[in-house]
């Protein structure tokens, strides 16, 4: 999971700089956003072609759905928010493991709900308060990406098994002052100090929670478990920016970031309680 996180961080380094370069070179045109969008679309197509050509389907033919219609009804359970939060599609787990997944999934959802919203509002804040240009915002994300890559490459992949929740707690606790500092920052130096704390949380929380969840279930269940887990993250990322932007434009950046930062106390408390309730390792499934 740390290697996946490093790959994500590298994309976080290169992507914003490419977008900023496009925006600056095309700023004289009224539709400067079209070329970056087409470039991203082309990369996605190339990625799909690469996957098709280099990866083989792991599901044996005899276990695949016989028709699209027969699998469509089952797919609906993977987009129902309530079924996702309760991990209902996951079958044949012990009650203890199922409850642990539900708690971890809910914590992950809350964390990304608050995180994605404040992350989305960051461009508004830097433009309104510091008059950052597109290139300056790209450089800002470049620095954050470098910090994330260093944290994941030098620290996260060395975390011993069983310590994921402890590191995750540290990451969420760190992001509380991070967003508060960003919200009240009046100089670029203060902003970047908050961003470095933000980078630590960004580089630790999601990889550690994903690693923790991946320990549950048997070989035939892990795909479903991780798929539901990632779907919860996507749902949070869909709702978070809307909620955060509403507060940002209604009450201002200071209130938005202070309240948003304090909201992270909720997943900290829930994760701490879950840590106390867990004892031993997940059940081994075959």
Language model region names:
Residues 23, 150-164, 248-249:
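Helix-to-loop junctions at the C-terminal end of transmembrane segments
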Residues 58-106, 128-129:
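Juxtamembrane intracellular "pre-TM" segments in multi-pass secondary transporters
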Residues 97-122, 196, 200:
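Pair of pore-lining "gating" transmembrane helices in MFS-fold secondary transporters
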């Amino acid at each position: 999971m740390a290697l996946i996180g490093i790959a994500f961080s590298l994309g976080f380094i290169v992507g914003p700089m490419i977008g900023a370069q496009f925006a600056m070179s095309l700023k004289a045109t009224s539709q400067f956003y079209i070329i970056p969008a087409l470039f991203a679309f082309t990369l996605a197509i190339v990625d799909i072609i690469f996957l098709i050509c280099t990866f083989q389907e792991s599901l044996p033919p005899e276990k695949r759905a016989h028709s699209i219609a027969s699998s469509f009804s089952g797919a609906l359970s993977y987009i129902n928010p309530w079924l996702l939060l309760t991990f209902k599609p996951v079958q044949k787990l012990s009650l203890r493991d199922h409850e642990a997944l539900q708690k971890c999934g809910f914590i992950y959802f809350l964390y990304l709900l608050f995180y994605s919203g404040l992350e989305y509002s960051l461009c508004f804040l830097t433009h309104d308060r510091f008059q950052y240009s597109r290139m300056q915002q790209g450089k800002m994300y470049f620095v954050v990406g470098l910090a994330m890559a260093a944290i994941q490459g030098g620290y996260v992949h060395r975390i011993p098994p069983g310590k994921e929740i402890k590191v995750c707690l540290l990451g969420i606790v760190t992001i509380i002052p991070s967003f508060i500092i960003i919200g009240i920052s009046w100089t670029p130096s203060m902003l970047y100090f908050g961003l470095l704390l933000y980078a630590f949380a960004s580089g630790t929380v999601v990889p550690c929670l994903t690693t923790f969840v991946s320990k549950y279930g048997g070989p035939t269940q892990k795909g479903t478990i991780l798929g539901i887990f990632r779907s919860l993250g996507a749902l949070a990322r869909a709702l978070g920016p809307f909620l955060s932007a509403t507060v940002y434009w209604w009450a201002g950046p200071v209130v938005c970031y202070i309240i948003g930062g304090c909201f992270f106390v909720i997943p900290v408390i829930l994760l701490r309680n879950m840590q106390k309730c867990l004892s031993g390792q997940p059940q081994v499934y075959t």
